[in-house]
Regions:
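N-terminal secretory signal peptides that target proteins for export/translocation
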Residues: 1-10
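Short, aromatic/His-centered strand-loop micro-motif at the edge of beta-sheets
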Residues: 137-159
Length: 244
């Protein structure tokens, strides 16, 4: 379904079509294409102060694609943590994103970040090649979930889906080049914890992030983007169509 936009100055051979797709439940989306190279991403906020060399860079693997290189020194207590700044009041949500591990170390993302060093962590374990869930609070760590041994190859793009629902969390992942829908994949990690009831999504440690989408329903991922660098623009706002 579509509607012709009103009040525009139309060229006789062109008009705008605005698709009537609802994105009311999309809390946040960013593919970093509007950010300046070598600067922090403008749509993100610092959720935890620390050493900060974060910046948007050219994708080392996919030409002409911009990605977020998060602070390289965030290891337990040194570097900054960046958050989306749009999900602080969010209790339940889904997140889809692409992530590249530049080196073999402990790194990943935070969710239900409630401020400072109070958050849940999903990270890649250097010594086990697993994904783990951790709670960080008052400078202490508590593990509450560990996956089987996974590939988790460095310098390679992976696609993730995180489900945050009540006290229960699950993670699905795949090679970013694979077209298999997340709906057809089984979780690689599941865990439960009841400490933090709401909070934001963000980075942890040195990772490259791209095509980050936070939404309240899986249906909202139908077309915020195709999660792919070759088609990472939103097609739901408008298109220009030539009329012969």
């Amino acid at each position: 379904m579509y509607a012709v936009s009103k009040g525009a100055n139309f060229h006789p051979h062109y008009f705008f079509i605005t698709f009537a797709t609802s994105q009311a439940e999309i809390l946040f989306k960013d593919n970093f294409e509007g950010d300046a190279i070598d600067n922090p991403p403008k749509n993100w906020a610092v959720g935890l102060e620390g050493l900060d060399d974060s910046k948007v860079i050219w994708d080392p693997d996919r030409p002409k694609n911009r990605v977020f290189s998060s602070p390289t020194e965030r290891h337990d207590a040194k570097g900054a943590v960046y958050i989306t700044g749009k999900g602080k009041g969010g209790t339940d949500y889904y997140v889809q994103w692409e992530m590249l591990y530049p080196k073999d170390f402990y790194m990943g993302i935070v969710f239900r970040h409630t401020g400072g060093e109070a958050f849940y962590l999903l990270d890649r374990r250097q010594n086990t090649k697993k994904l783990d869930f951790w709670k960080r609070q008052k400078a202490k760590w508590e593990n509450f979930g560990s996956s089987a041994v996974l590939d988790l190859e460095i310098e390679k793009w992976w696609s993730f889906q995180l489900k945050v629902s009540g006290n229960d969390f699950e993670v699905k992942m795949k090679d970013s080049e694979k077209k298999t829908p997340f709906a057809k994949l089984k979780p690689v990690l599941e865990g439960s914890h009841n400490e933090f009831k709401k909070g934001d999504f963000g980075n942890y440690g040195w990772v490259l992030l791209d095509n980050v989408v936070v939404a309240t329903e899986l249906a909202d991922f139908s077309n915020p983007w195709v999660i792919s660098p070759v088609n990472s623009l939103s097609t739901s706002w408008a298109v220009i169509k030539r009329v012969d």
